[in-house]
Amino acid sequence: MKNAMLALSRFMSILGGLVLSFLILLTCVSIAGRLLNGLFHSDFMTGIAPGFSRWMIDIGVGPVTGDFELVEAGCAFAIFAFIPLCQMTAGHASVDVFVSFLSERTNSFLRMVTEVIFAVVLVVIAVQLASGMFDKIENRETSFLIAYPVWWAYALSLFGAIAAAIVGVYMAVVRVYEFFSRSIIIPEGTEAGH
């Protein structure tokens, strides 16, 4: 089970990384297009190369239409895509100043409670995201600029949220078992399986 959860976590992280890479490329293209569009509209370019400037504007050199909408949807997915690996490797930011002096047993209890709370929160988020997605489907809401159905972004995020919830519940079960059996199944702070 641990290997399956780790494989799911890694797959989601790779997918999230690919989506973020696409969004970076999209943003760069959009910024370059916006800059070039401004240049071709400038008095300088229209003065020295009016035909070329008009041609570049006419072929559509400019920002990517709906880039903000796509970045918004993609970032939401990417966040959910990275959560499973953070859960598996205890990679979330934490401050241990207040717990470093506590016993290992107390820290194990705190890890268990934290994982259970995190699992509950991830399940609630996934359920609420599904509810919101069904509302968007029913209302046929579309994005403003490129008019794609908003539920597509919700569905993409829901895919990531479900994966995060599955791994979150798994980690909660693992930490509960570890606490009561006084054993370590998945070491904290290192990638499982290494």
Language model features by range: what are they?
Residues M1-H194:
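Alpha-helical transmembrane segments and membrane-interface helix-loop junctions
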